From Swiss-Prot:
Main location: cytoplasm
One Pfam family here: Maf
Record EC number: 3.6.1.9
NCBIfam families: maf
Family membership noted in the UniProt record: Belongs to the Maf family. YhdE subfamily.
Organism: Koribacter versatilis (strain Ellin345)
Catalytic activity: dTTP + H2O = dTMP + diphosphate + H(+); UTP + H2O = UMP + diphosphate + H(+)
Name the record gives this protein: dTTP/UTP pyrophosphatase
GO molecular function, a single term: dTTP diphosphatase activity
Origin: domain of life: Bacteria
Amino acid sequence: MLRYNLGMGLILASASPRRSELLRKARMVFRVEPAHVPEVHTAGEDPKQYAQRLARDKARAVAAKYPNDFVIGADTIVVADAHVLEKPADEADAARMIRMLSGHTHEVTTGVCLCGPNVEIVETETTRVTVAEISDEEIADYIHTGEPMDKAGAYGIQGMFSRWVTGIEGDYFNVVGLPIARVYRMMRRAGVL
């Protein structure tokens, strides 16, 4: 397990089981304290700035309660055809999103904020993902698994959707939900490790 300097704790400001799993696999000791902040994309807001803003808002919200600990806030968005695709509102929305991804390359951006005593680092990681053509029947079958309903862009690259991923440029773990190598570098730079 990683040991942290300064005797401080590490908090993940997210309820995402995928983010928790990635941190655990990286042998980081942390606790989960989900942040509850509005996730509203304003018209004209750059997608990367949007991801950074949400990550910062989440980290700050939790850091305000635990000022002596380090907090990781993150937000992942999918951008296809200049449209930000967040978590689908319902099955019809999920189908719409998957049709946008089908046969195209899109970007997945995660904003990450590390907040702690006298430290705030905010960065983004962007990965390009290419998806094969997906038939309407395949889309319906995929949606009925329930897998896309709690994920940005209506898919999980680590699950059934992987059968349609034909290429990836960048950090795979970013697409899962947390660019763990970037988080590690941020923690080193902040003196946490």
